[in-house]
C-alpha cells in the first residue's frame, strides 16, 4: 500500500482518456440559441445601374406589428416574380390563407423597379444577419436579379430592415395582379 497514489493516478488517467476519446465531435461553429452571425459582403455594390429586373424574391414577416399600425400587419408574405410567372402568398402565423399566381405584364417590372429605387433596396446589398434559435417566420429575405447580371441580396431573420412603406407598396403591387 506504499504506492497507492500511482494506482489512483492511473485510474484517473484512464477515465479522463475515455471521456476525451468518446465525446461527441462538434462543428467549429456551433449554432447556439442566441448566437449571432453577421456577414457583410464588402464587394456587394450599394448602387445598381440596371433597371431590368428578371427575378424578384422577397419573404418577410409582419407578425411583430400591431394590426393598428398597418393593413399588412400580422402576416407572413412571399412575393415572387420572374419574366414568366409571379406568385403572391399570404399566410397567418399558423395557416396558409392564400397563394395566388399571375403572369406579370410589361408594366409590372417597371413599377417594381420604381419601388426598389425609391426605397434604395441596394443600400442593404450584401448584409446578412442571423440569430440562431429564432422561429422561422421572423425577419426577411430579399433577392433581386437583373438582366445585366447584377444582384441585390440581403437577409435578416430578426427584423425587417426595409421601411414599412416599402413593404406596403410591394404588397399593393402584387395584390393588384390577383
Show which residues each predicted segment covers.
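Broad, structure-driven detector of short, well-ordered beta-strand segments within folded domains
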Residues: 66-82
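Short, well-ordered, aromatic-rich surface patches in folded extracellular/luminal domains
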Residues: 22-70, 100-107, 111-116, 120-178
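Residues that act as N-cap/strand-start positions at coil-to-secondary-structure junctions
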Residues: 73-75, 96, 136
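Core hydrophobic alpha-helical transmembrane segments of single-pass membrane proteins
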Residues: 7-17
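Acidic/histidine-rich, surface-exposed loop or edge segments in extracytoplasmic proteins
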Residues: 86-99
